[in-house]
Amino acid sequence: MRLGPYQYLADMVVMHYHNSSLNDVENKQRRRCLVAIAGGLGSGKSTIAGHVRDRVEEQGLKCQVVTVEGFLRPRADLSEEQLNKRGAIDTLDGDAVLHMVQDLRDSRPGEDVHLPGFDEHTRETVPDGQVIQPDTQVVIIKGTYILANAQPWRKIGGLVDERWFVFVMPDVARERGARQYLDKGIVGTEEEAFRRYDEIGVYTNKYVNRHSCRVDVVIENNDDTVPLTE
């Protein structure tokens, strides 16, 4: 029987975890398995990560999904131009994201890790808004630029076990991106949503499509079939 794409990805993660070396030999503990999933606005990172998490947990491993949106730089530190395109790569604290991934890499099940979160309603970061639980064995880290080839982001790829990129066609990304702006209350009308995407979102998606590091899997998420390319 042919495996579905989410099950295939989950099986890869579980295999990585069980095949990882026992770095902490004295306590016989495997380190956490880390997966980075990148993709532009409207690519479906959150949906894919959620499906994979559920299937990983069905196989007996505790899995959590975290976002890097909590690492947005404070508004006071941004120029007017940056405020207008908040969410672009230069409005995120890339060094802090890199340190977060390193901390997760060095941590072991049995240790909790506190991370900043992001409130979708207020559009503000939340200190300690995300907590990796002590018994978590797999962490899926999602972020638009998590696998960008710009410094310091490009160092992240060497710290994770799996690197996935979600690709969508431009017209699909535009429709989904505009819908996200509406659903999150960033704009009030469909016309404003498409205008914002054409002024901001399209450049974000072009950037990540052109400036991402080498990945292990490309996920083409243009419809419900979600084909994979290794």
Feature roles, as predicted:
Residues 48:
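Hydrophobic positions on the alpha1 helix immediately C-terminal to the Walker A/P-loop
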Residues 128, 151-154, 182-230:
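Small-molecule kinase domains that catalyze NTP-dependent phosphoryl transfer to phosphate-bearing small molecules
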Residues 45:
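Conserved lysine of the Walker
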Residues 1-36:
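Extreme N-terminal, non-catalytic leader segments
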Residues 42:
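Walker A (P-loop) phosphate-binding loop of P-loop NTPases
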Residues 54-64:
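Post-Walker A helix-loop "phosphate-sensing" segment adjacent to the P-loop in P-loop NTPases
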Residues 122-183:
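ATP-dependent NMP and nucleoside kinases share a basic, alpha-helical "lid"
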Residues 64, 73-122:
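Conserved nucleotide-sensing/catalytic segment adjacent to the nucleotide-binding pocket
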